[in-house]
């Protein structure tokens, strides 16, 4: 049955009926979710519809299912080039070319990527400050494009060197979460059996360093850390929603421009919405490591540079048993491990 649907999808694709092709491939995937061919072919239909982030996600899934499927690398490279993700595209195309050296399409697209990367580097005029401010007040948490059809709420906040995206999805097993990072792409896919899949696949406001990005699946949410390629303040999470600015010390949160979305509905009170989000975060009941991480993060975000250095040094040197914010106290000595009352410190030899 799945193959019959895929055959009909191919016929629709040939007839330039790409929406129907996507729908039929999706039904085939529901019946056979481990077929890499279906994902690679749906990626091609998405490319025709100019849904490039969806195409990248499908190509990544096809590669995960079958790393030797050459056309999956071709689809990923093509979609990434459309998104101006030339380095990510080049990496995918080079991998595909290594599998099938005789395929001329790869060489042609790789040459095009090299040319576009060179042109992009020529156009880079972003000034880099000689010194960075010692303390920067992080912008407030910003609510993102929440629509009535969104399955899970998500939001982000940022620091000078990273953007942290939180998806509030409770009780999701780690194996049901698939997250990919591109040069300027984030792809979050949550697939729970018996439920509609959740997709968060924005083209990001700024470029990131994929190898330094990471994520963690917690009991109440998924936390994603995006390492910024440039030390700039993102005006939003998504591309094209405002100019980038260099961070300034102690910028008032009142100056931060909040996102406005075209709508026929009553204008939202973003100050009230932000207060509600912060209250939900504050009231959120976490346990174990998740609670400790939240506590540590909240203190760290509001600390100055000396406090952050003190916290990091004391926590690391004491093996997690001491957390100090006094740099004058801990900066000149080694912090010994101090077990809680009633517990004994033991050293293990391997």
UniProtKB/Swiss-Prot annotation:
- In this chain the SGS domain maps to 260-350
Q: Which residues form a coiled coil?
A: none
Q: A GO term (biological process) for this protein?
A: innate immune response
Question: Which residue range or ranges hold the CS domain?
Answer: 149-238
Q: Which GO terms describe its molecular function?
A: protein-folding chaperone binding
Mutating residue 168 to S/R leads to what result?
A: Diminishes the interaction with barley HSP90
Question: Which family would the database say this protein is a member of?
Answer: Belongs to the SGT1 family.
- The protein here is known as Protein SGT1 homolog A
Which organism does this record belong to?
Answer: Arabidopsis thaliana (Mouse-ear cress)
């Amino acid at each position: 049955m799945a193959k019959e649907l895929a055959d009909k999808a191919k016929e629709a694709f040939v007839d330039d009926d790409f929406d129907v092709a996507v729908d039929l491939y999706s039904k085939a995937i529901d019946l056979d979710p481990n077929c890499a061919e279906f994902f690679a072919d749906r990626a091609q239909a998405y490319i025709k519809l100019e849904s490039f982030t969806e195409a990248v996600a499908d190509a990544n899934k096809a590669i995960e299912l079958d790393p030797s499927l050459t056309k999956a690398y071709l689809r990923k490279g093509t979609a990434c080039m459309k998104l101006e993700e030339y380095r990510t595209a080049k990496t995918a195309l080079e991998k595909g070319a290594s599998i099938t050296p005789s395929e001329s399409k790869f060489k042609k697209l790789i040459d095009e990527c090299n040319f576009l990367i060179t042109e992009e580097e020529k156009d880079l005029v972003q000034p880099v400050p000689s010194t960075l401010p010692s303390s920067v007040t992080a912008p407030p948490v910003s609510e993102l494009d929440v629509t009535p059809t969104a399955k899970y709420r998500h939001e982000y906040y940022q620091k000078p060197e990273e953007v942290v995206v939180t998806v509030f999805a409770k009780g999701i097993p780690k194996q049901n979460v698939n997250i990919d990072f591109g040069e300027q792409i984030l792809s979050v896919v949550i697939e729970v059996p018996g439920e509609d899949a959740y997709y968060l696949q924005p083209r990001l406001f700024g470029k990131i360093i994929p190898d330094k990005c990471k994520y963690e699946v917690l009991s109440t949410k998924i936390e994603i850390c995006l390492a910024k390629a440039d030390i700039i303040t993102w005006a939003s999470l998504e591309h094209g929603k405002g100019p980038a600015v260099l961070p300034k010390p102690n910028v008032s949160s009142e100056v931060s421009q909040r996102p406005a979305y075209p709508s026929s509905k009553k204008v939202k009170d973003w100050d009230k919405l932000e207060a509600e989000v912060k209250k939900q975060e504050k009231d959120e009941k976490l346990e174990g490591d998740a609670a400790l991480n939240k506590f540590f993060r909240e203190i760290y975000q509001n600390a100055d540079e000396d406090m952050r250095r003190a916290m990091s040094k004391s926590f690391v040197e004491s093996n997690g048993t001491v957390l100090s914010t006094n740099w004058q106290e801990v900066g000149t000595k080694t912090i010994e491990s101090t077990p809680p009352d009633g517990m004994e410190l033991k050293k293990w030899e391997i």
